């Protein structure tokens, strides 16, 4: 007797084993699975700019790595007592600009080197909603508690994402033709605008990935979102906020991921 709907895993054209070098970019879900990979001593580099949730900020991280970018003080903003980067998570912020730059540049340098030997790039998107800095005219990875009036918030379309990533991944593939890209959508729900808006956001991400899969033969998809929605359809697999996935849920998805 089947007591749950089981999500079928489409095997990608590659295998992940101890010879595989991985880079993982995106939401906190990437950090959860990445922590498992690191624990079992896989060669893994996770989020050189910290946690990023939307597709354009993940693309920005990749652009920084491809360009071998080194940040200067001109790339930072002052917010109260802290120097911050709009491309980075708050863990890179510091009271002194030099300390902030040291954290950013040393981490980027490590990841630039790792990318050159990466076999599998894992990208997890969490939301299609983005914040664009009005004065700078660019989408940010983190608002760093600047006033809400500094930003314009809007939802990307599948076409927006497809256009950016078709160009970006084509350039990446041209430089590293043996690299494979594995997309996932984070099952963590973004509840700010309610249930319906969260589903619309996830749908945008899923449609964009499907378009990229059809267009680029080195792109694959791992259904972490579907596994949680169908196989783990129970709040005991969530943390107390009822939005994030519990350790037990992460363990379940990790077991599925290992079968790739």
Language-model segments: which ranges?
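Extracellular glycan-modifying ectodomains
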Residues: 1-260
């Amino acid at each position: 007797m089947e007591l749950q709907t089981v999500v079928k895993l489409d095997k990608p054209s590659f295998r992940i084993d101890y010879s595989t070098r991985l880079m993982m970019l995106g939401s906190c879900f990437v950090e959860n699975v990445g922590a498992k990979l690191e624990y079992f001593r896989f060669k893994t580099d996770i989020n050189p700019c910290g946690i990023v949730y939307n597709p354009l900020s993940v693309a920005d991280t990749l652009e920084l790595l491809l360009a071998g970018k080194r940040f200067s003080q001109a790339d930072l903003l002052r917010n109260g007592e802290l120097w911050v980067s709009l491309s980075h998570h708050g863990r890179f912020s510091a009271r002194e600009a030099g300390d902030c730059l040291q954290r950013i540049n040393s981490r980027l340098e490590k990841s630039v080197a790792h990318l050159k030997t990466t076999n599998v790039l894992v990208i997890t998107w969490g939301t299609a909603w983005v914040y664009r800095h009005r004065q700078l005219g660019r989408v940010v990875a983190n608002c760093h508690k600047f006033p809400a009036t500094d930003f314009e918030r809007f939802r990307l379309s599948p076409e927006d994402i497809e256009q950016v990533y078709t160009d970006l991944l084509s350039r990446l593939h041209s430089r590293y033709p043996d690299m494979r890209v594995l997309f996932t959508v984070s099952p963590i729900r973004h509840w700010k605008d309610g249930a319906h808006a969260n589903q619309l956001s996830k749908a945008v991400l899923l449609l964009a990935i499907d378009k990229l899969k059809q267009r680029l033969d080195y792109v694959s998809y791992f259904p972490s979102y579907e596994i949680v929605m169908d196989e783990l359809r129970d709040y005991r697999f969530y943390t107390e906020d009822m939005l994030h996935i519990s350790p037990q849920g992460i363990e379940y998805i990790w077991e599925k991921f290992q079968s790739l």
